[in-house]
From Swiss-Prot:
Gene3D superfamilies: 3.40.50.360. Signal peptide: none annotated. The lineage of its organism: Bacteria, Pseudomonadati, Pseudomonadota, Gammaproteobacteria, Lysobacterales. It catalyses: 2 a quinone + NADH + H(+) = 2 a 1,4-benzosemiquinone + NAD(+); N,N-dimethyl-1,4-phenylenediamine + anthranilate + 2 NAD(+) = 2-(4-dimethylaminophenyl)diazenylbenzoate + 2 NADH + 2 H(+). HAMAP family: Azoreductase_type1. Keywords: Flavoprotein, FMN, NAD, Oxidoreductase. Its cofactor is FMN. One of its GO terms (molecular function) is oxidoreductase activity, acting on NAD(P)H as acceptor. It comes from the Bacteria. Belongs to the azoreductase type 1 family. It is an enzyme of class 1 (oxidoreductase). This is FMN-dependent NADH:quinone oxidoreductase 1.
Amino acid sequence: MKLLHLDSSALGANSISRELSAAVVEQQRRLHPEVDVSYRDLDRDPIPHLTAQTLAQTDPAEAAAAEAVMQQFLQADVIVIGAPMYNFAIPSTLKAWIDRIAVAGRTFQYTANGPEGLAGGKRVIIASARGGLYADPTNDFQEPYLRQVLGFLGVDDISFVRAEGVAYSPQHRADALASALAGLSEEEAAAGA
């Protein structure tokens, strides 16, 4: 089994989404000892945003880098994404990655019956950290967007591990992280049963 682990937080060691995504990967290692993990830090090693130049793919090095991102996605059975909520959505570094994998004819196609995803059969686990509480979905453009774009590509096995309200106070941050990690432990225990 191949697992692709992505982090997109700019907060480095202070990032809750990084801590959660690492915990998810460790859980997957315990459940599947044979797992082959690839890692990309989209903050430290960002993918260039789409421009007229990158779309034209006139630079062979740029084209090769884009193809490497695509192949890494296509070959993964499980994808773990550390995705903090920035301004109600996702970091632009994560959006740049999505722009490189959402390619007509590769991961989706248009048919007479409408769009069809070509990248099914994958499991995506999103480790989400949010400064506020988003029980009211009108302010949440992160989770619906990720579900929509991944679903458009054919991915229908999508789950979220959330730590919310982490900016309220140090205690709330610790409690939110502990709750998210406890949920992972419960899931692992159920999978092992």
